[in-house]
Amino acid sequence: TQAVKETYGKMLFYEDKPIEAFYFSTSCGRTADAGVWGTDSGKYPYLRAVEVKEGGKSLGKEDNDGFESYIKREDVIAYDTSYPMFRWQTDLPADVASAQISGAGQIQDMTVTDRGPGGIAGELTVTGTDGTVTIKGQSAIRSALGNPSLIITKKDGGTMTGSATLPSAFIAIEKRTGEDGSLSFHIYGGGFGHGVGMSQNGAQGMAKTGKGYKQILDFFYNGTELRECNEG
């Protein structure tokens, strides 16, 4: 593509140091900061939690009510809105969750008890017949709640299966009881990937609105400078 040609042989720098240019597939309309990996986000000031739309407002931590109402909406305006994984849903049977989350016994409930900037799940508390288990970090939460048998229904109605982890940790969880008394957890989700840095489909969406590569890179890696490799 033209952007690839124009950036060939160049690197992004922040205060004279090459950056960690993290990227992922699709956003939920928001990004996360480097704190999702337990890292001090202050070490990566160019990796911010922002709204992935015109203006790119910076985001702080959010409570469950605010984020849950956001992630359940499919009409959110964002650069990624038109992509199927912008919103997705799945059902996790309690017996499947109980088999792969050790220490809780037969699971009776689960709640997101901490969210990072942008609303990404950072801590999940699981309650069962044997006690309470706390799962921390977006990667661990995605692994705990994912299973290859789950059917992920995308925004466009398409489905995917076979993934051992959830597509992202931008999630809201709703406990449901079936007519037969079986317990399950309905998961509303958005985006695909860890959510830090540049959304590839968000960048595509920006390009479609006429944004150039410099604008796109500055949006996702704020305050950085693109230089020839030999300038560093």
Segments the model singles out, each with a brief description of its role:
Residues 1-232:
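Conserved, single-site charged/polar hotspot
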